């Protein structure tokens, strides 16, 4: 997942980096040539408004996504002081498996089964490294320490079972948020934002070309005047085409239904988690 995110971010930055220097060089060249003799052309208000909305939306997602991506970090709310227990568990499994090599085939059979079961349990525990799972494992250890005869042992046992259910539900919620929100933003919206940056630069370039064409008309000799005017009309058409193309892309990015559904998915998955967790916890009998 981290590799994928790095790849997407790298593509976006590379696209921006390749466009920005060209736009700056073009602007510098034109301003040097024109000076203050030609007033900068104004772009249509509806285009400018859409462009600003896209920039604002990108900034909004850049604020929210890194925080929501926390759900993709293994054990993000897992107590640090409990990780040693999990590490020790892993060492125990590895030790038992390594010791199999010193036994005869007949002796290996039952222990191999134990080692395999322990490895399977360890693998199964990895996706559910949440605070709830840590509470569950701690309560389970407490039950063992107290012994079956202690009247409070069953209470710790119930806590262990219920907290494990909630922890597993949280793991499901986090996976759903990652799939329905984080991956969608990275795979769909970020490439569109990169494309929006490219077409924005293209519009600016076409505008500068039109300004240059108009400057050529002012300084054209009579025999070249019609040619220069034709170049202005061509530049106007290219600018209008670039603006219309950009507006279509901007409107796709700003689609209210798509973005609302995307954001709603965070709340929907949280709501489902809390409802399912409440139902699971209501089974308590202590």
From Swiss-Prot:
This is Meiotically up-regulated gene 64 protein. It comes from the Eukaryota. Keywords: Cytoplasm, Meiosis. It comes from Schizosaccharomyces pombe (strain 972 / ATCC 24843). Its main location: cytoplasm. GO terms for biological process: endocytosis; meiotic cell cycle. CDD domains: BAR_Gvp36. It is found in: Cytoplasm. The keyword Iron does not apply. It holds the Pfam family BAR_2. GO terms for cellular component: cytoplasm; Golgi membrane. SUPFAM superfamilies: BAR/IMD domain-like (SSF103657). Coiled coil: none annotated. Has a role in meiosis.
């Amino acid at each position: 997942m981290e590799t994928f995110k790095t790849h997407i971010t790298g593509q976006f930055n590379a696209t921006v980096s390749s466009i920005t220097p060209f736009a700056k060089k073009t602007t510098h060249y034109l301003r040097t040539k024109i000076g203050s003799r030609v007033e900068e052309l104004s772009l249509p208000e509806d285009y400018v408004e859409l462009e600003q909305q896209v920039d604002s939306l990108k900034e909004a997602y850049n604020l929210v996504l890194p925080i929501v991506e926390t759900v993709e970090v293994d054990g993000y709310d897992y107590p640090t002081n409990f990780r040693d227990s999990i590490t020790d568990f892993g060492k125990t499994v590895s030790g038992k498996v390594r010791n199999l090599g010193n036994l005869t085939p007949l002796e290996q059979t039952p222990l191999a089964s134990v080692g395999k079961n322990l490895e399977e349990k360890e693998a199964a525990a990895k996706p559910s490294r949440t605070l709830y799972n840590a509470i569950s494992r701690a309560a389970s250890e407490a039950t063992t320490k107290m012994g079956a005869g202690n009247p409070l042992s069953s209470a710790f046992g119930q806590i262990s079972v219920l907290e494990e259910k909630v922890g597993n539900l949280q793991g499901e919620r986090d996976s759903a948020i990652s799939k329905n929100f984080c991956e969608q933003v990275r795979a769909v919206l970020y490439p569109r934002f990169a494309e929006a940056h490219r077409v924005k630069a293209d519009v600016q370039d076409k505008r500068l070309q039109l300004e240059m064409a108009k400057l050529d008309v002012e300084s054209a000799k009579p025999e070249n005047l019609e040619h220069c005017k034709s170049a202005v009309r061509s530049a106007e058409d290219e600018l209008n085409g670039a603006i219309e193309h950009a507006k279509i892309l901007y409107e796709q990015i700003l689609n209210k239904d798509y973005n609302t559904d995307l954001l709603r998915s965070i709340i929907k998955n949280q709501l489902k988690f809390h409802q399912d967790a409440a139902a699971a916890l209501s089974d308590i009998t202590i």
